[in-house]
Amino acid sequence: MNISEHTDNFIQEMKRRNYSQNTIDNYTSCIKHFFEQSKKDHPKNINETDIKTFLMNFKEVNTQRNYHSAIKKFYDICLGQKNKFRYIPYAKKNNKLPIVLSVEEVQKMFSVCENLKHKVILSLLYSCGLRVSELINLKWEDIDRSRMVINIIQAKGNKDRQVMLTPELIPLLEKYWHQYRTKEYVLNGQNPEKQLKYSDRSILEVIKQLSSKAGVNKRVYTHLMRHCSFTHMVENGTDINLIQKLAGHSSVKTTAIYTHISHNLISKIKSPLSNIRL
């Protein structure tokens, strides 16, 4: 089998094993990108040096680990070579707090956004705190206007959840639908007739372009708007347990990171000295 046939087999086997659609799409995108860059005609022609060189192209540790997992799983499922690249260590996770934008910086990005589709992307990521994979897989039927919620189906960990449908999104989504007439998925790729979904790389590029145009001099990464969304919710006084549910976190400890990266919270703390007459 060639690479394309192996990839199709990879997809079918992941479906058979009941992987979530987000995981299937994520791993498939990673594998396709990897083999495009490798320029090899068969998976067996890939060696450890090829993979190490490819992974070093990514500055983000999480991105490296994501591609590493996808490649490892591909060789396990398709070629039965579970330990083929066992000597390639995973990039070590760092404990640095994620970079977030201020509300003013987010506003600048919206102000310079003239493309309707790009504004929908930015709005959904920021208003709902969606993961990029969740936005890519979002269908029109998932948007429940009667209850003002968006249903996130088979999210990370194969769990469903709901997030709020912000009233400001309604007219924007209506305008978008009338202009693009997308059918199943809210976002379509470059060939709408084939109902191809948007790619995660395309969404990251949109965020990068908007931040650059807005003069935001901070590092842009895939989950930037998600982190901004929840950090700003914390600053607005939203209960951390509610944010945990919106984020789809299994533990509130994961959500607590947003209290650590919120600089505004510190300035809002009332010192007990405030009640003392000096």
What are these regions (language model features)?
Residues M1-L278:
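Conserved catalytic core of the tyrosine transesterase superfamily
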